[in-house]
Amino acid sequence: MGLAHSDLFGCSGCHTPHNAETLPGVPLWNGSETTLTFTMYSSASFQGTIDGQPSGDSRLCLSCHDGANPDFAWMDPQHSFGSDELANSHPISFVYDSALATLDGALKDPSQASTLGATIAEDLLDPESKVQCSSCHDVHTSGVGQSQLRGYDYGPQHGPELCRMCHIK
């Protein structure tokens, strides 16, 4: 396992070695949950049901990436991360299951293999079968400026490999 943002924060950016549960169920978390209310993703073509607010580990990500943390003021304002505006991002905090894949028609069944070694469900979804920030972003990989995208080739031939793990086209 690599170090998330090792160039900037190391492990202590997210973890604290001597405060085992600052948030219930989140061992070694070095922070508090965000208190902002977020504008969630919305689209007429989206077939899933998104939680009213971010859930799961996305809430942990947003404790820093919510636009209120001065340590992240350097983030590109053209991107919607680092703010309470999630309406233009990839949706998070929704169940991705076989029923959604069938209904949508452009999503792979989560029981299919991913390019990471197991199934989409095992590699990318949280324990509640939900898509979260960590579905696409591997927080334990170094490489600031690359958004820590899972299985993404940052070489000259890069393309939408990550997107195609779930999306048919």
Task: Identify the residue ranges that each predicted region occupies.
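C-type cytochrome heme-c attachment and multiheme electron-transfer modules
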Residues: 1-12, 16-169
